[in-house]
Swiss-Prot record:
InterPro entries: Neur_chan_lig-bd, Neur_chan_lig-bd_sf, Neur_channel, Neuro-gated_channel_TM_sf, Neuro_actylchol_rec, Neurotrans-gated_channel_TM, Neurotransmitter_ion_chnl_CS, Nicotinic_acetylcholine_rcpt. Disulfide bonds join C150-C164, C214-C215. GO terms for molecular function: acetylcholine-gated monoatomic cation-selective channel activity; transmembrane signaling receptor activity. Expressed in the brain, liver, olfactory mucosa, pituitary gland and hair cells of the saccule. Residues 358-367 have a biased composition (Low complexity). This is Neuronal acetylcholine receptor subunit alpha-9-II. Residues 413-422 have a biased composition (Basic residues). It is a multi-pass membrane protein.
């Protein structure tokens, strides 16, 4: 072990001597090479020959892609190789020294620049050292952050792909003085750092020889095309999916009840939300003629929502047209109320979907009810004569059972011949204020069967029914006679005419309510129809827009 220590020390001393000797030779070599050398002239022995420069680009990172300003910021490693005829030596004269590294500012360098540069700073690559070999070959590796102009096509945003060019060439030397060659057929991507927004699918290179108008000599250049594909997941979840969900709210506006008063508000709110998303996309896109795919989707959705809001206003106008409007046309009754209501499952509350009846039949029955010339002793028998067996509605039956009117005791009446009377509305002008004369003396008459039932009224207007019953009770006594016997002389004709007039008013009110209900049902069926139409439109539009993505 002790014998090995002197050997190691001797070897270390030899290495130090060798390094110091090599350092002395390198210093001597640099002094000899730079003694009569000038870096201002093109280093060729024959000035008529072109100097060949080999260019190789390594793409390290895509730092940013500014679509609005159309600028690509990339981090590159640029390698240039050429031969200097004045920087050669015999390696045997310098202890076998083959390679030295010297500052690049000491030697001649080709003036290769990025033609499509978009940076305000015109500085080139860093002044790193060059590698000089004994045969005159110089290799210069320099990093550079480039800002190049790139024509951005956003027609398929966010599913777009871009092609950005990096064109390198000599700024002052033409092709007869400096010829540029490609070191590889494409850029080197072996050290590429993945970008979170863009995928790089390649970097092919092409050589071009261009004759410019200013000069008659050819100028060669090398163009590297960076193939970029956008990662669309971010935009799908932050721009496309919210728009897709919001667009499905537009058809639901037709499902809202018209009486809620929120149908138009929903459409306007959805329209404003899409406008905000549209402005966000417009701010990030360049102001060009090409409209991005997501912009087309927004515009189509906004157009659909505008149309749905306009249709909602139209349908609400139908819903609230009221009884003063014209009756529903026959074709609308047949097409909308009879057929479309069954297709779109539009039924009234409490109506059996299996045995749905049209409201037009009930309205026709009401009109017959008001035009019948034969009146029975009470309202119940009158309705049976007009095709309404069992009473007018369930509410009237419940009213009779819950509030039975007591029978007033009186002498038993024998059946006598009855007289039926009927008047029209044209006779109401002939009714004088003396039509109630003589009735006060008959307040103690026995009550008939008609007093067991409340007068008919519109089932949709309970307040009107109560008021009408009160008016009848105050005017004619404890009940309204529907018919009279021949034992009431002097009162029967006037009383019957007044009762007929009141009954006609109630019938007319029922017909008016039925007409308004028909318009409401038409509006409800149209709401359901447009709801399904717009649901289908939203779905198909989304499929078509996404299907256009490359």
């Amino acid at each position: 072990m002790r014998k090995m220590v002197p050997v190691v020390c001797f070897a270390t001393m030899l290495l130090q001597v060798a390094h110091s000797a090599q350092g002395r030779y390198a210093q001597q070599l640099l002094t000899d090479l730079m003694e009569n050398y000038s870096n201002a002239l093109r280093p060729v022995e024959d000035t008529d020959k072109a100097l060949n420069v080999t260019l190789q680009i390594t793409l390290s990172q895509i730092k940013d892609m500014d679509e609005r300003n159309q600028v690509l910021i990339a981090y590159l490693w640029i390698r240039q190789t050429w031969h200097d005829a004045y920087l050669r030596w015999n390696k045997e004269d310098y202890d076998g020294l083959e390679v030295i590294r010297i500052p690049s500012s000491l030697v001649w360098r080709p003036d290769l620049v990025l033609y499509n540069k978009a940076d305000d700073d015109f500085s080139g690559p860093l002044d790193t050292n060059v590698v000089l070999r004994y045969n005159g070959e110089i290799t210069w590796d320099a990093p550079a952050i480039t800002k190049s102009s790139c024509v951005v096509d956003v027609s398929y945003f966010p599913f777009d792909s871009q092609e950005c060019n990096l064109t390198f060439g000599s700024w002052t030397y033409n092709g007869n003085q400096v010829d540029i060659a490609m070191g590889m057929d494409s850029g080197d991507l072996s050290d590429f750092v993945e970008n979170v927004e863009w995928e790089c699918h390649g970097m092919p290179a092409t050589k071009n020889v261009i004759m410019y108008g200013c000069c008659s000599d050819p100028y060669p250049d090398i163009t590297y095309t960076v193939l970029l594909q956008r990662r669309s997941s971010f935009y799908i979840f932050n721009l496309l999916l919210p728009c897709f969900l919001i667009s499905f709210l537009a058809p639901l506006g037709f499902y809202l009840p018209a009486d809620s008063g929120e149908k138009v508000s929903l459409g306007v709110t959805v329209l404003l939300a899409l406008t905000v998303f549209q402005l966000m996309v417009a701010e990030s896109m360049p102001p060009s003629e090409s409209v991005p795919l997501i912009g087309k989707y927004y515009i189509a959705t906004m157009t659909m929502i505008t149309a749905s809001t306009a249709l909602t206003i139209f349908i609400m106008n139908i819903h609230f047209c009221g009884a003063e409007a014209k009756p529903v046309p026959h074709w609308a009754k047949v097409l909308i109320i009879d057929y479309m209501s069954k297709i779109f499952f539009v039924y009234e509350v409490g109506e059996n979907c299996a045995t749905a009846t049209s409201s037009s039949s009930s309205s026709s029955s009401s009109s017959h009810f008001g035009q019948d010339d034969v009146h029975q002793p009470n309202f119940s028998s009158h309705r049976q004569a007009n095709g309404k067996p069992g009473g007018n509605s369930g509410r009237e039956n419940q009213y009779r059972h819950k509030n039975p009117r007591p029978q007033t005791p009186g002498p038993q009446r024998h059946p006598k011949p009855r007289h039926q009377h009927h008047i029209t509305r044209d006779e109401k002008n002939h009714l004088s204020s003396s039509k109630y004369e003589g009735f006060e003396s008959n307040r103690n008459l026995p009550l008939g069967d008609c007093c067991k039932e409340a007068p008919p009224c519109c089932p949709e207007d309970e307040k009107t029914a109560v008021v009408a019953a009160a008016v009848a009770s105050v005017t004619f006594g404890p009940c309204v006679f529907c018919s009279h016997g021949s034992s009431l002389p002097g009162v029967d004709s006037k009383l019957v005419r007044n009762v007929e007039y009141i009954a006609n008013c109630f019938r007319e009110q029922r017909a008016t309510c039925a007409k308004g209900a028909e318009w409401k049902r038409v509006a409800k069926v149209m709401d359901r129809f447009f709801m399904w139409i717009f649901f289908i439109m939203v779905f198909l539009m989304s499929i078509l827009i996404i299907g256009k993505a490359p």
